[in-house]
């Protein structure tokens, strides 16, 4: 896709320079081709939806990174929601996806990241996800809240594609009779809301996951009205959580004899009339302490506990179950995944179990033996297996199965190998999915094309922008978040990064550097204080001095690669500092709230303040009128840029684009 990038609304700070209005010429438009830099995955893929009849038609959803359609021609996923603007970013969290079983071209995406935000929208496509009609709905969604791996909450009636049901978290059951164009609440559906104390932060993530699963039983319904028998599960515990309608959704009643000691997480209906549900004592992905797998024979009205791991004493299991899937061609073949099992009952990690006799016996897939191919996303080799909140058996190929994780997902094409005692082979299925959270980017002039600081997975060094980092995420140490990464502009091989540690790494420091362009890393010997982490890092043009402003801290200077530190004088706390790309003695920082430009001419030891006549509109984060957050790791207008090859040449971005084009206040600042 070709897009136009215009250099408008960008302000040039001219420290100590004369008026240059006459030197500023109009900037012509430049054509750019935009594409993702592949990391592959990097975020929670919390749901996969296969079309039941059309081979190769499948979609996946993420908690806050949009939705994707599988493209068999390119053998990767295609993003569907990259067109959503910053102002509409709440729609990037996907609550559910539904495909019309009678028409694979009709797909519906329920969007909304947080129930505390504005109402959500349902995006309706009738051309396989190539275009969408946006339908605003009068209820909120929680694509990034607890229970986001449950599902599916939205389903198209398999016998009447005009009818769609949508289960919400806080607003009950809704129905569309016109392919998603309008929605009405099903007032006869029972109240499944939960009460919680808004002041209790521990309860925030579970203030109500609401309706989590919808299943249609098509047996015996062939009158054109749609499906008569519909099952709906709600994330409730200690009260009835599974309901059925036998009159096309007009009335509802709880299914008798159901287990109420857990919350449903997933539900499938087998071809021989068994409703199979996984349960946990939380919706997940929060920790589970109990759960089970149960099946309900809808013809005999009989419940059976078919949990793969059962305790003889009847106590809490210490873990729960996340998801279940059934072979479309053999109703006795199912797989089920656990949550919070690792380190318990002889299992090193969470497990996926397979049964070929309808749940009478199960075999553990990972414990029996497995092989992983990490080549498509090398960083996953050190990422632990977790959050298997959707598992799917391909309806067109029973050997092909997938499971999701917090960094993407895996797939196999020899699922039945476990029955023969052979390894099940897994490879990354996330090609094309890019859900990482970039916190900082650095592009050296030579060597690596890009060095990134990433949320959750540390960071990467890309020597080829078309391939994942073959070295995996940065090591020594592994960071969870890398909030700062930069280098010495006149000494290109020197790179420094700061962040927060991933997991338990005794003795590890939260600052590390590379002297070979990001290939290998060395931990600094010390940090300024015991609490120093994250924040921002600046490196002198020749690498002789580094300045680190840890999170919520004053700035510190080192001239010996972190062996010792001293406080910088003349700066407020938590301010972002950058280095001049020509003069190694010069550093700068901006306080956009107070409109002050700080500069140092002694290698960062001391800073002096000058008034900054900042006329451009500033980014307001939070409530209307709130001041920009100084030191914001994701941007804000305290981020300034130094120009390579030009001493004292600094740039700052205007949040309103070309609106600030007319502003011109010299000699301190020019708007271009």
Say what each PLM segment does.
Residues 65-66, 113-117, 171-172, 236-239, ...:
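Short glycine/acidic-enriched loop and turn motifs that connect beta-strands
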Residues 662-668:
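Conserved small/polar residues in nucleotide/adenosyl-binding loops
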Residues 52-54, 101-103, 158-160, 218-226, ...:
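Residue-level detector of Asp-centered blade-edge/turn motifs that repeat once per structural unit
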Residues 38-65:
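Beta-strand-rich domains and repeat architectures in extracellular enzymes and scaffolds
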Residues 42-43, 84-88, 139-142, 190-193, ...:
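Short coil/turn segments at the loop-to-beta-strand junctions that recur within blades
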Residues 83-87, 137-145, 188-205, 307-315, ...:
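Surface-exposed loop and turn segments in beta-propeller and other repeat-based domains
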Residues 44-47, 91-96, 148-153, 200-215, ...:
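Signature of short aromatic-glycine-proline-rich micro-motifs recurring in repeat-based ectodomains
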Residues 66-68, 120-124, 172-175, 241-244, ...:
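A short loop-to-beta-strand structural motif that recurs across blades of beta-propeller domains
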């Amino acid at each position: 896709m070709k897009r136009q990038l215009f250099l408008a609304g960008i302000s040039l700070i001219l420290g100590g320079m004369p008026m240059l209005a006459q030197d500023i010429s109009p900037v012509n438009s430049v054509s750019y081709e935009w594409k993702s830099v592949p990391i592959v995955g990097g975020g929670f893929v919390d749901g996969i939806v296969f079309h039941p009849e059309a081979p190769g038609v499948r979609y996946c959803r993420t908690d806050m990174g949009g939705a994707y359609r599988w493209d068999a021609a390119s053998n990767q996923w295609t993003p569907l929601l990259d067109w959503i603007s910053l102002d509409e970013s709440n729609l990037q969290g996907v609550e559910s996806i539904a495909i019309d079983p009678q028409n694979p071209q009709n797909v519906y995406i329920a969007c909304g990241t947080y129930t505390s935000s504005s109402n959500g929208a349902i995006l309706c496509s009738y051309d396989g996800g190539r275009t969408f009609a946006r339908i605003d709905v009068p209820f909120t969604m929680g694509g990034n809240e607890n229970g986001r791996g449950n599902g599916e909450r939205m389903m198209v009636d398999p016998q009447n594609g005009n009818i769609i049901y949508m289960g919400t978290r806080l607003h009950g059951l809704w129905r569309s009779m016109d392919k998603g164009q309008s929605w009405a609440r099903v007032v006869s559906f029972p109240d499944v809301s939960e009460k919680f104390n808004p002041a209790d932060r521990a309860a925030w993530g579970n203030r109500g996951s609401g309706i989590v699963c919808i299943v249609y039983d098509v047996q015996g319904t062939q009158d054109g009205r749609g499906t008569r028998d519909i099952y709906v599960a709600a994330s409730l515990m200690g009260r009835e959580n599974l309901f059925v309608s036998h009159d096309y959704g007009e009335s509802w009643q709880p299914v008798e004899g159901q287990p109420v000691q857990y919350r449903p997480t997933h539900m499938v209906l087998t071809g021989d009339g068994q409703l199979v549900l996984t349960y946990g004592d939380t919706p997940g992905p929060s920790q589970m302490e109990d759960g089970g797998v149960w099946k309900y024979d809808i013809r005999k009205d009989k419940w059976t506990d078919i949990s793969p791991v059962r305790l003889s004493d009847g106590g809490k299991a210490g873990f729960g179950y996340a998801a279940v899937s059934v072979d479309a061609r053999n109703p006795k073949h199912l797989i089920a995944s656990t949550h919070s099992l690792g380190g318990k009952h002889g299992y090193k990690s969470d497990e996926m179990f397979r049964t070929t006799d309808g749940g009478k016996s199960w075999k553990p897939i990972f414990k029996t033996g497995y092989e992983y191919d990490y080549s498509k996303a090398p960083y996953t080799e050190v990422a632990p297996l977790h959050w298997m909140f959707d598992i799917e058996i391909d309806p067109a190929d029973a050997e092909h199965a997938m499971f999701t994780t917090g960094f993407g997902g895996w797939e196999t094409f020899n699922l039945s190998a476990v029955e023969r005692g052979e390894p099940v082979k897994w490879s990354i299925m996330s090609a094309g999915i890019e859900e990482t959270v970039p916190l900082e980017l650095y592009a050296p002039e030579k060597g690596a094309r890009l060095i990134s600081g990433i949320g959750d997975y540390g960071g990467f060094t890309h020597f080829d922008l078309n391939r994942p980092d073959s070295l995996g995420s940065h090591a020594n140490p592994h960071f969870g978040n890398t909030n700062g990464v930069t280098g010495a502009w006149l000494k290109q091989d020197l790179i420094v990064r700061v962040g927060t540690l991933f997991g338990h790494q005794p003795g590890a420091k939260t600052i590390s550097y590379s002297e070979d362009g990001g290939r290998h890393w060395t931990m600094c010997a010390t940090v300024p204080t015991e609490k120093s982490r994250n924040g921002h890092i600046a490196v002198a043009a020749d690498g002789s001095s580094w300045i680190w402003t840890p999170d919520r801290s004053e700035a510190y200077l080192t001239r010996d690669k972190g062996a010792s530190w001293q406080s910088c004088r003349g700066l407020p706390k938590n301010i972002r500092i950058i280095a001049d790309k020509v003069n190694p003695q010069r550093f700068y920082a901006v306080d956009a709230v107070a409109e002050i430009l700080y500069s140092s001419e002694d290698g960062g030891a001391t800073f002096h303040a000058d008034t900054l006549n900042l006329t451009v509109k500033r980014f307001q984060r939070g409530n209307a009128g709130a001041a920009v957050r100084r030191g914001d790791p994701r941007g804000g207008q305290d981020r300034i840029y130094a120009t390579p090859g030009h001493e004292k040449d600094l740039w700052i971005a205007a949040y309103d684009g070309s609106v600030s084009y007319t502003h011109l206040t010299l000699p301190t600042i020019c708007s271009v």
